[in-house]
Amino acid sequence: MNTLKVAGKFLDQPMLVAKFHNAVPTILTAGAAAYTTKEIAHAPQEKRKKAAIRIGTTMAFTVASALAAPKITNKLFKDADEIPKSIKELKKDATGLVEDFLKKNQVDEKSKQLLEKAKENILKYKEVKTLFKNFENNKNGKELLNKLIPDPENIDSKEIFSEIGRLSVFGLIPVLGGITGGIIGDKLTTDKWKKKIPDKIKEGSYQYLANIFLCNIGAGGALAIMEKLNIRSKGHRAIGMIGGIIATGVIGGSTIANLIGNKIINPLFEHGHKHKKEHLFDERKPEPLDIGLHTDDIATVAVMSGLKWIEPALPMMYSVSGYRAGIGYRNGKPHSDKN
């Protein structure tokens, strides 16, 4: 087994994925608190109280919605047997598999020690590599390892659009949460809060369309084509999905998002308002962080490729888009900074 496959197996250990999943709320909350503290400290002394309320409210709603997104999407899209198991359940399953295998098969002492460890603990990279190497010519051993650490499953044509929908709803929830928190934060700190709503919705649509939805469409569309052509290689499918993401999200995403903003969102908010010239017709241009946000598209490829380890990180990735929507970011300073 080559290095990449061993790395994939190591990262896809159910107990490792479950522990990472359980740690995400703490990691995301701590990161959000640190960023909020930094932003408040950088605000002018006389504006720090309002900045704390505005930024804190926006961040709180963003983080809360991002952490709620997995539960919501699981209820909407996943069957009961697909919902991740608890660590206790995983240990029970692993113990049963290992004990049943050892009763029926003779193995070397080193492999036995590692299997005993695998009942209730996460194996190290070298230990995973050792087990797969030792069981390379052992059919029953291979079957056991694939039960302990299941292989990624290619999504079939029937599941593609459901997965696009699930990931798109997953990404939408933090964006809506960020916008809601941003509006509440503005309402608590300024009488001009209504004037700031258009930029939040425009940035929300930009983040969602350019950095989330259209990228999912690109990846899913490419995957559907490869499924129709019966391309089963995970490497070729990954390359195809990345190509789809580049075409729809990275290249065309900002253009499409700005077009929708100018043709739909602007007319909706400009009617009867006095703030026609305040950024409403400015195009939102991609910045380095926007390009960086496309790292979550690698997560999209990984999830659609059946890898388990990346999914727990999605709330952290999508919360960046949610927060930017909440502050009504435009190129330059966020609109929320202006009073």
Describe these PLM feature segments.
Residues 1-339:
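Glycine-rich, hydrophobic membrane-spanning regions of integral membrane proteins that mediate transport
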